[in-house]
Amino acid sequence: MDSNIKKLLKEFYLIQCKGWVKNTGSGTSSAGTTLEHLFGKQEDALPLPDYLGIELKTKLITSKYEIRLFSAILDNKPDLMNKLWQLCSWKCTRNGGTRSLYDNFNALQYSNTHRKYAFKMHINYAKKCVELLLYNNWDKKKVNIDMSWSFRELEQRLKIKLSHMALVHAEKFVNKETKEEKFKFLDITIYKLKSFDVFLKLLEQGIISVELKMYPFKDTERQDKFRNRETTFCISQENLPLLFEEIDTSNYVIN
C-alpha cells in the first residue's frame, strides 16, 4: 500500500499544480466528481475504492455536510427497499406531487420528523445485523417491519471500500457573469480504517448515522425507477479519527 499512497500523493501534487480547474461534475458532489476525473476515473456506482485501493472523499471548506462513507441496501430479504418505499414514501408537493422518501437517523433516538413514520437503528449482536426500526408518529406505536443490514454485508462494504481513504479539501469559485464553476484542491489526508468492531460501536453511540434517500425519476417513462435508492452511512469530519487512523505522509518522497 505504501507504493500506492506515493502514487496517489504524486498525482494529487500534479493536480494541485493546475490551480483552479473547471467543474466537470454536477450537483452537490461536483467537486468530488471533478477530482475523480482529474485522477482519470470515470463515474460509476461500483462498491470499490476509487484509486489504487484508496477511496477518495472530497469536502468543500465551506460545507457543513457529513462525509458519506458507503451505501448498502437492506438485505435480510429481497426487494426491501421497494417495500420500504411503498410503506413510508409521501407525496412531495414541491416536486409536482411525485412521491419521495428521505430522512437521517441514528441508533440513539427516532428521527425527529413531523411525517407519519420515524426511523431508528438497533445493533443486534445476537442476530449479527443492524435492524431498522420504525415508529408510527400518528398512532404513537412501533411498527414491526423486519428489515436489517447484515454484519457480513456491512463489514464487506466497509473493508473493501474504506480500508484506506483520502480526504481532500477543496475551494469553489463561481464566475458571477458566466456562472462557470471552478475548484481548487487544497490538501489531502490519508486514513487507515481501524476495524469493523469500532464501526459498530460508533453506530451504537450515534456517531455514525444513516442517510436515507429514495427519489423516482420525474419523466413518465421512468417513474417506476429510482434516481436514488440507497441508505448511506455517514460521519462528521470531526469524528473521522474515531473510525480511522491518520497516516503520516510527511516522510513520503514524491519522485
Where are these regions (language model features)?
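Nucleic-acid endonuclease domains
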Residues: 1-52, 58-255
